[in-house]
Swiss-Prot record:
Domain EH: start-end pairs: 460-571
Sequence similarity: Belongs to the IRS4 family.
GO biological process: lipid metabolic process
Taxon lineage: Eukaryota, Fungi, Dikarya, Ascomycota, Saccharomycotina
Keyword annotations: Lipid metabolism, Phosphoprotein
Biased composition (Acidic residues): 389-402
Protein name as annotated: Increased rDNA silencing protein 4
Record's compositionally biased regions (Basic residues): 409-438
Stated role: With TAX4, acts as a positive regulator of INP51 activity and phosphatidylinositol 4,5-bisphosphate turnover. Negatively regulates signaling through the cell integrity pathway, including the MAP kinase SLT2. Also seems to be involved in rDNA silencing.
Quaternary context: Interacts with INP51.
Bias-annotated ranges (Polar residues): 50-65, 248-260
Positions of the UniProt region annotated as Disordered: 38-135, 152-260, 277-304, 323-445
Modification type Phosphoserine: residues: 180
Biased composition (Basic and acidic residues): 365-377
Length: 615
């Protein structure tokens, strides 16, 4: 029975070229696969698998019973989940009446045949390119040929429907029936494969407990091949050779689970799967050392111990400070040769390190670096810019005896203390209670030199008189009674010798104090003795003194005392007794008065007693 295939076929966006020999081989391979499945269904026997976890192993009768019961109960439900796609059966292929009415079975047969054809074509192409005489996929499957095709179609439709329902399940949650079908499909295709990641643990029906989800094992694991177990090294060495000529390790998964995919996607997936064994064989050392531990260690020469050591060293540096490093640091560079696999060590390279800020010539730098390497090195602290200058013992300028302590580099703690002491703000100490020097009078802040006294001091009088001299005799001709306007010469003879100041000028001067006008008018009325719009020297000085007293915070007195008027013309004592001293003196005076009263009373008693005794 032959099928007539075209030489080129456009499918899924790609053009596939099939020869007549490849088409016939693909058809025969598909028939052999179908017949093998039908024979396996008639006498189910689960293949021998090796599980890494001993708790997941089950006996063969439990797999048979669970497979039969679940196949009877869920066959009808799962067949409804198969997508219905209109396809045509291959030429000269007769289907049984039982399967002709189901379009899902026809679709699965046609798609499976196409995938098997693509598989055989890819295998034949690889064998022709490599010029090898090994057996192809067709020779591997010839042994399994049986004449029964009707049973094959039935088991294929059931397997496709069950695979559609179990796609969303994890390996630990799949039913034993579905797992047995997968093992049947993988039994003949994984003959020379070292391990298979699709092997999954079976569930225990008696315990009725689902196994926990676990991460799939690495691809390279030990498995039973035929009747004996091969060593791991032999399998790893032979897998790179057999992977090109044997069936793909994942062919069973593609046939059972990928019945609805396009031909182009199948070819791409087959090419990717074929490259996996060769990659695994080249990385045997990495995978064998990391079996069951997840991803391999991709960072060479690195382990958790090195990471812990780095963290401990970092913590010690933070707590105890960094250790003093030699300025003559040496760095070694290793160059690895890929051809010989030997490591050659280059000569050590010495880098110049110095703490000098000024640049020097190249020869001086080399001499300085050599002196640093020899160990003739000392430091001297420079307090001006808070740095350390480096000096050699051979320098003629260095002082040997006097600055021996200054040339040694202090500890890190001492340097930090010195830096804090120089940079921190110094706390201001409390000033002494008694003033040791006289403070100058501040015209902007006159209240700072104020003392509670009842007379004009000498300093105040001098300030007021300076303002008087600079503003007197100005604009007096504006007055109505001024003699120059009336021509009366007698009025000039009655004016005071010190002169007069115009009231308008006094008002302008006093307004600079920012006191209210009402308060200034009240002060003017208290010191105005002439009542003619002018002020004489005494009135102006006393008025200025009252303005300053108001600025100091004292209340304006109702009547200006006579001692204030007298202090303007007389030189008062500059010694001012503090208020506390006056209070102490008053207290002492009251105490003396009490003592005198007691003495007087005592004397009176003595006089009375003497008088009574004499009488």
């Amino acid at each position: 029975m032959r099928l007539s295939f075209g030489k080129q076929r456009y499918h899924g966006g790609t053009t596939v070229t099939l020869t007549e020999q490849g088409a016939s081989d693909s058809l025969r391979a598909a028939q052999a696969i179908f017949q093998n499945h039908s024979n396996e269904v008639s006498s189910p026997c689960p293949p021998v698998t090796v599980s890494r976890n001993p708790q997941t192993r089950l006996s063969e009768p439990s797999l048979q019973k669970s497979g039969r019961k679940q196949e009877q109960k869920k066959a009808r439900i799962r067949t409804k989940q198969v997508p219905k796609i209109k396809t045509t059966a291959p030429n000269d292929v007769e289907l049984s009446k039982k399967h002709r009415s189901s379009p899902a079975g026809k679709d699965n047969v046609s798609s499976t045949a196409q995938m098997a054809a693509a598989l055989a074509h890819s295998q034949s192409k690889l064998s022709s390119d490599n010029n090898s005489s090994h057996s192809s996929a067709l020779d591997t499957l010839k042994v399994l040929e049986t004449p029964n095709l009707n049973g094959l179609l039935g088991i294929h439709s059931r397997s496709s429907s069950r695979n559609g329902s179990n796609e969303s399940l994890t390996p630990g949650q799949r039913t034993p029936d579905n797992r047995s079908q997968e093992n049947l499909l993988t039994s003949f295709s994984s003959g020379r494969r070292l391990s298979s990641s699709s092997m999954e643990p079976a569930t225990n029906k008696d315990s009725n407990k689902a196994l926990p989800k676990r991460r799939p094992s690495p691809p390279l694991q030990s498995s039973l091949v035929g009747s004996g177990q091969l060593h791991e090294n032999e399998n790893l060495s032979s897998i790179s050779i057999d992977s090109r000529h044997s069936l793909n390790p994942d062919t069973s998964d593609v046939i059972s689970n990928r019945s609805q995919t396009s031909l182009s996607q199948t070819i791409n997936q087959l090419s990717l799967c074929e490259s996996e064994p060769s990659i695994a064989s080249s990385n045997t050392t990495t995978t064998t050392s990391n079996q069951g531990s997840g991803l391999p260690n991709l960072v060479p020469n690195y382990s958790s111990d090195m990471r812990k050591k780095k963290l401990v060293n970092k913590f010690k540096r933070k707590v105890f400070g960094s250790k003093p490093k030699h300025l003559s640091s040496q760095y070694e560079m290793d160059a690895s040769s890929e051809e010989l696999g030997q490591h050659e060590q280059q000569p050590s390279m010495r880098f110049k390190t110095t703490l000098r800020k000024t640049s020097v010539s190249t020869n001086a730098e080399n001499d300085h670096a050599s002196s640093l390497h020899e160990g003739n090195l000392r430091y001297k602290y420079n307090p001006s810019n808070d740095t350390y200058d480096v000096y050699d013992d051979t320098d003629s300028d260095s002082e040997s005896d006097q600055n021996q302590d200054a040339l040694t580099k202090p500890r890190k703690r001492d340097r930090i203390k010195r830096k804090i002491r120089n940079s921190a703000n110094k706390t201001a100490h409390h000033r002494p209670i008694h003033r040791t020097r006289d403070r100058k009078f501040n015209e902007d802040k006159p209240w700072k030199s104020h003392t509670d006294i009842t007379f004009v001091t000498d300093n105040e009088r001098k300030r007021y008189e300076s303002m008087w001299v600079s503003n007197r005799h100005r604009h007096l001709n504006l007055l109505s009674w001024w003699p120059s306007l009336t021509g009366d010469s007698g009025a000039i003879n009655t004016l005071p010798e010190d002169g007069l100041i115009l009231g308008i000028i006094v008002r302008d001067i006093w307004k600079r104090s920012n006191l209210p006008n009402s308060l200034l008018a009240e002060i003017y009325t208290k010191v105005d003795t002439r009542k003619d719009g002018t002020l004489d020297r005494k009135s102006f000085i006393v008025g200025m003194w009252l303005v300053d007293q108001c600025l100091y915070g004292r209340k304006l007195p109702n009547v200006v005392e006579q001692c204030v008027w007298d202090s303007v013309d007389r030189y008062a004592s500059t010694m001012v007794v503090p208020v506390s001293t006056l209070k102490a003196m008053a207290k002492q005076k009251r105490k003396q008065m009490k003592e005198e009263i007691k003495n007087i009373k005592k004397e009176n008693r003595v006089v009375l007693v003497d008088h009574n005794s004499s009488s």
